[in-house]
Amino acid sequence: MLSGKTVKLIVFELLQFACLCIPVFVVMERFASVIRFVKSSDTAYWLVVAASVAYAASVTLFVWVPLKYFMLKTQRFSEVTNWRPVTLAYVILSTLPCFAIIIASSKVQADAAIRFDRLTELPVSLVLFSLICVDIVERIRPLRLTGKASGLDLDLEMPGPVLTHLEQVTSISGHLQANGQDGDASFRSPVSNGSLSGRWEDARTYGLPRTSSSAYLYSHSHSGPFSFLWKRDPRHDLFVSSFMFWLDTVEMVRVAGTNSVFYSGWVFPIYILAYLSLLRVVITPDSPLLALSSILSQDLPFLVVRICLLAVFGYVTPVLYILKNILASISFVYFVFMTKLKLLNRGSMF
């Protein structure tokens, strides 16, 4: 009888394989329908369908299966920590050709002066949903699917802080200076090799100097008649965060599906920039590079394109997303770069 880990592995691999092939088949079939309508020929339709089957078979045999073999058997990519080979292969082998076919469909219909199919509902949604599913599988693969969440980050995950006590705390360095001792020489952190993550290091070390400030003590509240509402699971948060992470790109692709935009030249830069933003899925979720890549590949380019679309086509995109791109870009530049300036790096300001 198969073990739970084996069943989990089989389910994950089948799901990722389905996400690899199904979007290609659906998009190519819709494109074949456009070709049949333009050329009035069933032969062209079946040629496109056959090409999609041949492409999926070739990619599976020569790229996808060898990649999975190297990852699962030889552990060739076991030391890769900042990027994910599976998601990189997916966005190249599945998402890229799907976006290219959608752009080609727009071009074919625009040249033929017809408006047959904008591929807005099922094809585009399926491509983005498959990408999100692959991302979720890669993120949830190390976690258990049954029982309580395990692991250091999951065990230390706080369902929600509750302010239970407030008091004035004098810093450790202040006590040492009062006794004529050097705080930096006497107190040192017991963690020297970075074995603890940054967000928990302050809670587990005692030698970190702090200024005199209010100390907030937190506790978990599980009692009372509404204790059943005080629940949270990191695995559920993973699903929600994965969808929320791509909402901006989803909205940009939705704008490309409107009649006025899809049959114009603006569909090219929109889908190209949307694909560049999708490349962020290659970076691991906890990588420091993710924040900068989000600004450079999504917020700044999307801001420029949305302002141009607003000027050319009117309110085809909500102003809310423009404000989001502006605030995300400004806050990143300010907190990451400008706060390091001497003028803004003073403890007495704000």
Curated annotation (Swiss-Prot):
Domain of life, source organism: Eukaryota
Name of this chain's protein: Transmembrane protein 236
InterPro entries for this protein: Uncharacterised_FAM23-like_TM (IPR020394)
One term under GO cellular component: membrane
Transmembrane feature ranges: 9-29, 47-67, 85-105, 120-140, 259-279, 302-322, 325-345
Subcellular location: Membrane
Protein family membership: Belongs to the TMEM236 family.
Gene from which the chain derives: tmem236
Keywords, sorted A to Z: Membrane, Transmembrane, Transmembrane helix
Protein topology in the membrane: Multi-pass membrane protein
Primary location group: membrane
